Amino acid sequence: TTEIYTLSLHDALPISFPSLGYGLGLRNEYYEQILEQSPAVDWFEVISENYLVQGGKALYYLDAIAERYPLVMHGVSLSIGGPHALDTDYLKHIKQLAERIQPALISDHLCWSRGNAHQLHDLLPLPYTEESLYYVANRIRQVQDVLQRPLVLENVSSYVRSKLDEFTEWEFLNALSHLSGCQLLLDVNNVYVSARNHGFDAWTFILNLPPESIRQLHLAGHRDYGDYVVDTHDQPVCDPVWALYQRTLEHLGPVSTLLERDDHFPPFEELLTELSKARELGATALARRSRCA
């Protein structure tokens, strides 16, 4: 068995990050309703790439919403595990946006998404090997040196596995966090999807992550085709994912929780109702945790 090293490549950047509460992904379908209604949402997560522009309608709404709500930034183009050099211009623009809106955190995905210098428009999993571990950890250090803050990385949903794997995904995430000082965005739905597709236990995945490194949770819907499950973000959260979320909060305590929707957008009131469900189930889970403490 290959040993997983946990010696730090550099001193981890210290951070204190209390829970922000319950948030929604900021999507242009809801800009005007957010500003008109000032809904009871604790924070919003913005897709970083949507705002790497000079002026325009998107930045106008972003600035207006940033005056009322805490924000976090979530990227889809970093390609932290990709074979090509990190895009320094992209990182510069990410830092400029962060200086503009002062996000509570900056996240992206543990994946590769560029080939031959072109975006593949997909988030592809890495081979979980020792070589990959050190390669990605070094690239994380480069990103953190530019951003001057810890990078937060999300587990992606997966549909194939590499024959080269030496670790499980959760072992890889654990070691990567220790090596690089990065933090983790635990997507509960992605864990469920990958567990269904690959036949592992979702709770084993979550239980073996370092609790102190988990800074945010994602909830989303998927499509279940029986033999496989696809992460689509176009459905309400299903009951098994809600149950896994509650168990996760009982284990971790309060963690900033985001509800994602990226297609088949419902009326805004329906999304707020689903967020209220997350808040209620979260409160129940945290109450159980307190009673057991």
Located regions from the model:
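Non-cysteine beta-strand/loop elements that form the S-adenosyl-L-methionine
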Residues: 104-112, 184-186, 211-223
